[in-house]
Amino acid sequence: MSNFAIILAAGKGTRMKSDLPKVLHKVAGISMLEHVFRSVGAIQPEKTVTVVGHKAELVEEVLTGQTEFVTQSEQLGTGHAVMMTEPILEGLSGHTLVIAGDTPLITGESLKNLIDFHINHKNVATILTAETDNPFGYGRIVRNDNAEVLRIVEQKDATDFEKQIKEINTGTYVFDNERLFEALKNINTNNAQGEYYITDVIGIFRETGEKVGAYTLKDFDESLGVNDRVALATAESVMRRRINHKHMVNGVSFVNPEATYIDIDVEIAPEVQIEANVTLKGQTKIGAETVLTNGTYVVDSTIGAGAVITNSMIEESSVADGVTVGPYAHIRPNSSLGAQVHIGNFVEVKGSSIGENTKAGHLTYIGNCEVGSNVNFGAGTITVNYDGKNKYKTVIGDNVFVGSNSTIIAPVELGDNSLVGAGSTITKDVPADAIAIGRGRQINKDEYATRLPHHPKNQ
């Protein structure tokens, strides 16, 4: 039989106090909705239907082409949300997972175990439950003496005895698909909230003597539903521990994993060393035996093997093997650094390609440049690429030496093996093998300083 999935993502999330739909808030670099969608993939659903509502266009944009969408124009409860999927799923034979889009910590393994449990026990409905020493606020799972599920009782309706129950409803379920839509026709809004509750379907199945079961999560953290910023931070913390643990098991060293922030899609090779307060975001990839020191921040970039990045920022760029960057360097988007390049302290590179073995040791700006191999930039070198309206390119050949405090005004080309004298302002192309000097001649005026007020003779 087929598996189907319904993801509930229509809510506004008022307690988040945000213009962004709740399910689009990010945990470890991707939205909560994407986390749920990836986990749902573990059950290999034939159809996945996502119920949208508040700012539906933003939610749909995240999963465009990956799921079917239905709209819940009015948020009238979880049961009502599932009703919206009827045109797509009603009448199909199979098992349907119903899950909220604000549960980013649920794992694919747990969902696979849930649906296997449901099938193996021939249940018409299976509730995903969890156990906690502090069940306040959760619906409790009431069982009979044979451990069979009788009902779900909400906190406000629970007796003193029922409030002591530690097994809680996580809000995730698996149903026999055909029976689900038959039962939905019999639920109503006769409750304090005036809404259609999916939990009422469980009661209907019990009344008709059909088999309802419960599968209990091994890890309570997976049950976390995010309703406010506090829970969002908790989810981020749990996810960070999971991610860092995975990398450590795979051979990555962390000085302080609790103070290291790595997004879920980051790839790290073995033998990488990561110090505290390092942040790796987006689609970043780190090669083997690279060292990332305290304070390094890397976004959507590839760093090769054996590199050393010292307290620096790298954005949307590629860094080859053996490169050293920092401290306090900034590699801005669309840059590439060849093998064994050295970018030192207070150097900024933007939109430039730099050939292997090139060095810019300190206090240099390289913008919109194509730089060859074995080039040396002296301290204080500036490539001037912007005239207030347009950006221009500088091309620097192989084996070029640029003296300190030089200004290179684009568009200009420095030929192979050329040399720029220190303090020069270069406005014209420099031929290969030439020396370019673009500065005023030094003039010494003997004894002139004695006329100045600050000279000791005038004190």
Curated annotation (Swiss-Prot):
Residue ranges of the region described as N-acetyltransferase: 251-459
Keywords carried by this UniProt record: Acyltransferase, Cell shape, Cell wall biogenesis/degradation, Cytoplasm, Magnesium, Metal-binding, Multifunctional enzyme, Nucleotidyltransferase, Peptidoglycan synthesis, Repeat, Transferase
Pathway(s) it belongs to: Nucleotide-sugar biosynthesis; UDP-N-acetyl-alpha-D-glucosamine biosynthesis; N-acetyl-alpha-D-glucosamine 1-phosphate from alpha-D-glucosamine 6-phosphate (route II): step 2/2; Nucleotide-sugar biosynthesis; UDP-N-acetyl-alpha-D-glucosamine biosynthesis; UDP-N-acetyl-alpha-D-glucosamine from N-acetyl-alpha-D-glucosamine 1-phosphate: step 1/1; Bacterial outer membrane biogenesis; LPS lipid A biosynthesis
Active site: H362 (proton acceptor)
Primary location class: cytoplasm
EC number: 2.7.7.23, 2.3.1.157
Pfam family, one: NTP_transferase
Pyrophosphorylase: region residues: 1-229
Catalysed transformations (reactions): alpha-D-glucosamine 1-phosphate + acetyl-CoA = N-acetyl-alpha-D-glucosamine 1-phosphate + CoA + H(+); N-acetyl-alpha-D-glucosamine 1-phosphate + UTP + H(+) = UDP-N-acetyl-alpha-D-glucosamine + diphosphate
One Gene Ontology molecular-function label: magnesium ion binding
Free-text comment on the cofactor: Binds 1 Mg(2+) ion per subunit.
Top-level division of the source organism's lineage: Bacteria
Gene Ontology annotations of biological process type: cell morphogenesis; cell wall organization; lipid A biosynthetic process; peptidoglycan biosynthetic process; regulation of cell shape; UDP-N-acetylglucosamine biosynthetic process
Binding site for Mg(2+): D102, N227
Region (Linker): 230-250
Record flagged with keyword Transferase: yes
Binding site for acetyl-CoA: A379, N385, Y386, S404, A422, R439
Listed cofactors: Mg(2+)
GO cellular component terms attached to this protein's record: cytoplasm; membrane
Family classification: In the N-terminal section; belongs to the N-acetylglucosamine-1-phosphate uridyltransferase family. In the C-terminal section; belongs to the transferase hexapeptide repeat family.
Quaternary organization: Homotrimer.
PANTHER family linked to this entry: BIFUNCTIONAL PROTEIN GLMU (PTHR43584:SF3), NUCLEOTIDYL TRANSFERASE (PTHR43584)
Name the record gives this protein: Bifunctional protein GlmU
Organism the protein comes from: Streptococcus pneumoniae (strain Taiwan19F-14)
Lineage: Bacteria, Bacillati, Bacillota, Bacilli, Lactobacillales
